[in-house]
């Protein structure tokens, strides 16, 4: 009979040190980099910009209102955006 398998300790994830308030540098980075992303969602901004979810939602809402990005699909919780098509 095979020996009893030991329980693994599991992986420990470090606590994210994401920004919780907007400052000038974060706003500038969002305005410069996000319109170039092909796929834009709250989780993408949290991952790439190192901001928390509420800031990501505010940033996406602001960019959409200004017409910099456009909505592709809206799930019950997650909205998906893409860069705005170049006006021809």
UniProtKB/Swiss-Prot annotation:
Keyword terms: Cytoplasm, Ribonucleoprotein, Ribosomal protein
GO biological process: cytoplasmic translation
UniProt subunit comment: Component of the small ribosomal subunit (SSU). Mature yeast ribosomes consist of a small (40S) and a large (60S) subunit. The 40S small subunit contains 1 molecule of ribosomal RNA (18S rRNA) and at least 33 different proteins. The large 60S subunit contains 3 rRNA molecules (25S, 5.8S and 5S rRNA) and at least 46 different proteins.
Pfam families: Ribosomal_S25 (PF03297)
Lineage: Eukaryota, Fungi, Dikarya, Ascomycota, Taphrinomycotina
One Gene Ontology molecular-function label: structural constituent of ribosome
Function: Component of the ribosome, a large ribonucleoprotein complex responsible for the synthesis of proteins in the cell. The small ribosomal subunit (SSU) binds messenger RNAs (mRNAs) and translates the encoded message by selecting cognate aminoacyl-transfer RNA (tRNA) molecules. The large subunit (LSU) contains the ribosomal catalytic site termed the peptidyl transferase center (PTC), which catalyzes the formation of peptide bonds, thereby polymerizing the amino acids delivered by tRNAs into a polypeptide chain.
Further information: There are 2 genes for eS25 in S.pombe.
Family in the record: Belongs to the eukaryotic ribosomal protein eS25 family.
Taxonomy, superkingdom: Eukaryota
Protein name, entry field: Small ribosomal subunit protein eS25B
The organism of origin for this protein: Schizosaccharomyces pombe (strain 972 / ATCC 24843)
